[in-house]
Amino acid sequence: MRTNPTTSRPGVSTIEEKSTGRIDQIIGPVLDVTFPPGKLPYIYNALVVKSRDTDGKQINVTCEVQQLLGNNRVRAVAMSATDGLMRGMEVIDTGAPLSVPVGGATLGRIFNVLGEPVDNLGPVDTSATFPIHRSAPAFIELDTKLSIFETGIKVVDLLAPYRRGGKIGLFGGAGVGKTVLIMELINNIAKAHGGVSVFGGVGERTREGNDLYMEMKESGVINEKNLEESKVALVYGQMNEPPGARMRVGLTALTMAEYFRDVNKQDVLLFIDNIFRFVQAGSEVSALLGRMPSAVGYQPTLSTEMGSLQERITSTKKGSITSIQAVYVPADDLTDPAPATTFAHLDATTVLSRGLASKGIYPAVDPLDSTSTMLQPRIVGNEHYETAQRVKQTLQRYKELQDIIAILGLDELSEEDRLTVARARKIERFLSQPFFVAEVFTGSPGKYVGLAETIRGFQLILSGELDGLPEQAFYLVGNIDEASTKAINLEEENKLKK
């Protein structure tokens, strides 16, 4: 197999002489192209079709070589619609893989899979470009230290901490606060870690992509007046795009993130929404290329494709890419090959609960269902680990008692259980937190809570020192001192009412 020699090297190779071929066959988004003998393009090379259709409209379609068929023919997958293409049209081999702009110029902008801006804000500086197919960092470059990536969000840092350079799965239905949580993480990494974020919209709804962009502008994550002060670059390949674009848009976003890690030496947050759509697009392309399907109709190369993407998301000695991936579980079947392959790569899972959202507890992260491989005494220390376990035990006991409370009421519980319920309700409310990006809607200023402060707060609740405070004092506050202050204010308000 002729694989591209430039795939592990930044930038585009210099093209001495571009070879041209002719379209031989078109089946949907798949093109067969014949080249002169000895002029065959490499696998993953970008091919460009520039012509005019029968109405005289300009055609500009970029494809990616996937197979070498023999008899000087190659099979390529189009990255945009193939409408208007005809047999015999000229195809130019660019001599390099798809390359996209990288660096500060990408911040605050929206790109498609080819790295072209689609936000009508003018051209982007393309002086620095990277090919989207690159090797994962070598073993010797990897950072082997296990360290927590502090987010400033209490429920995440205490109960399901993120690993620096790790991969986190975000599970949640519509309307439970995925977008707000994503925006808060983007905001906090910029403020606390001096990092930037890249958002890859893989096969998502165009409306959702537009809503996210508007909300980011509203909350200040994207600075319209000075784009370079923005904290995020956006890359979209929506549901209406051909499968080739949806399959590669994750790599485009990852490539932009790699530049910030390797060249700018920053901590980067990479969001992929939705990782299932990446697999789904790969499955469509695999069928179009005539490969024999594997289990449940997925591509036989499912693990390889997932691995080549996930292995590039890691910490090096220069910086880190921490990835948060929304995971759609088809028909709620966790044994489906797509989510099952994804789970193998995840370090933590953040599960959003509709029950908590309906109670008005935001972020609606389920403290019992969310998990992390980092929650071990040798990594986080005994104090953190024991506090987290006691919080979980208290909440679990409260969950077990809820049926009894619903039928018989609180009075039928033992003294010990009543105390557990009271503390669990305080913990539940203290796990809520005002977000910076939600200030516009809530009117409450956002709070970033350090890990040490978070642990201290929960230790005080568990020790019983704060049993005398009303539970509403713990709702939507930052650290525990704010809860004490809020309790005093509530008491004064009650006195005034009387």
UniProtKB/Swiss-Prot annotation:
Q: What is this protein called?
A: ATP synthase subunit beta, chloroplastic
Q: Which function does this protein serve?
A: Produces ATP from ADP in the presence of a proton gradient across the membrane. The catalytic sites are hosted primarily by the beta subunits.
The answer to whether keyword ATP-binding applies is yes
Q: Which Gene3D superfamilies match?
A: 2.40.10.170, Bovine Mitochondrial F1-atpase, Atp Synthase Beta Chain, Chain D, domain 3, P-loop containing nucleotide triphosphate hydrolases
Q: Where is the signal peptide?
A: none
Q: Which organism is it from?
A: Oryza sativa subsp. japonica
**Membrane-related topology note:** Peripheral membrane protein
Question: Which residues are involved in binding ATP?
Answer: G172, G173, A174, G175, V176, G177, K178, T179
List the disulfide bonds in this chain: none
Database matches in CDD domains: ATP-synt_F1_beta_C, ATP-synt_F1_beta_N, F1-ATPase_beta_CD
EC? 7.1.2.2
Q: What keywords are annotated for this sequence in UniProt?
A: ATP synthesis, ATP-binding, CF(1), Chloroplast, Hydrogen ion transport, Ion transport, Membrane, Nucleotide-binding, Plastid, Thylakoid, Translocase, Transport
